[in-house]
UniProtKB/Swiss-Prot annotation:
Keywords: Amino-acid biosynthesis, Aromatic amino acid biosynthesis, Lyase, Schiff base. InterPro entries: Aldolase_TIM, DHquinase_I, Type-I_3-dehydroquinase. Pathway: Metabolic intermediate biosynthesis; chorismate biosynthesis; chorismate from D-erythrose 4-phosphate and phosphoenolpyruvate: step 3/7. SUPFAM superfamilies: Aldolase. One of its GO terms (molecular function) is 3-dehydroquinate dehydratase activity. The gene is aroD. Belongs to the type-I 3-dehydroquinase family. This is 3-dehydroquinate dehydratase. It comes from Methanococcoides burtonii (strain DSM 6242 / NBRC 107633 / OCM 468 / ACE-M). It is an enzyme of class 4 (lyase). Homodimer. NCBIfam families: aroD. GO terms for biological process: 3,4-dihydroxybenzoate biosynthetic process; amino acid biosynthetic process; aromatic amino acid family biosynthetic process; chorismate biosynthetic process. It comes from the Archaea.
């Protein structure tokens, strides 16, 4: 069974709201607008210590029942973390017991990535291993290889976000989504914007949305994504 917290991803895909500023207000708004899960973007919130991160998660747990994904994104993968890699990883390890899932990049140093995967397994937390390409969409075999590599590295969910150069790139990603289990796939930007609505129909377990400003190219707002997905049911 694949879950994040109490949310059963085998019953239906989840709308994940990316929390990037004013966390208490954004979490409240996300819940009101139909989000299923919250992604707490420590790197965008300017949180740099384990104590700050833990305090925030405790506050959020006191105000919402939605499950949380802890993310502390590398700059090279679209994030804003400015500290050392050791501190980035240590923060995620230290707050693991307070979250429901953790997102770690496939491109992270293997030993550091393995530390997060090991800790998540010990704490019975869901592990998302993610990869982002903001320039292009690789060929289908490479897309599958990246997802397989993430699963081999210990991912419960392999997340892949790529930038299409044409509609064939978008179709290729959707076809791979249909073929590989337990994935989250996103075709970014204007060309791929619709995949945030339809990729779940092909097997994507998660689809990400914003509460205010988009944190990734082509990201829709929670309420708009919720309405669109309900139309597809």
């Amino acid at each position: 069974m694949l879950k994040i917290g109490t949310f059963d991803l085998e019953e239906r895909p989840a709308i994940v709201a990316a929390i990037s500023n004013e966390p208490l207000q954004q979490c409240k708004t996300a819940a009101e607008h139909g989000a299923d899960i919250l992604e707490i973007r420590f790197d965008l919130l300017g949180i740099t210590t384990s104590k700050e991160a833990a305090n925030l998660l405790r506050m959020l747990k006191g105000t919402t029942s939605l499950p949380c994904i802890a993310t502390n994104r590398l700059q090279s993968q679209g994030g804003n973390w400015e500290g050392t890699e050791e501190n980035r990883i240590a923060l995620l390890e230290d707050i693991m017991h307070l979250t429901d899932a953790v997102d770690i990049e496939l491109e992270t140093d293997e030993q550091l990535r393995d530390r997060i995967v090991k800790k998540a397994k010990e704490e019975s937390k869901t592990t998302i291993i993610s990869s982002h390409d903001f320039e292009r969409t690789p060929d289908k075999e490479t897309l599958k290889s990246i997802l397989d590599h993430s699963h081999d590295a210990g991912a419960d969910i392999a997340k892949l976000a790529v930038m299409p150069e044409n509609m064939q790139d978008v179709l290729n990603l959707l076809e791979v989504t249909l073929e590989v289990d337990d994935v989250c796939t996103i075709s970014m930007g204007k060309l791929g914007k619709h995949t945030r609505i339809i990729a779940p129909l092909y097997g994507s377990k998660l689809t990400y949305a914003s509460v205010s400003d988009a944190v990734a190219p082509g990201q829709l707002k929670v309420e708009d994504l919720k309405k669109a997905m309900e139309m597809m049911e």
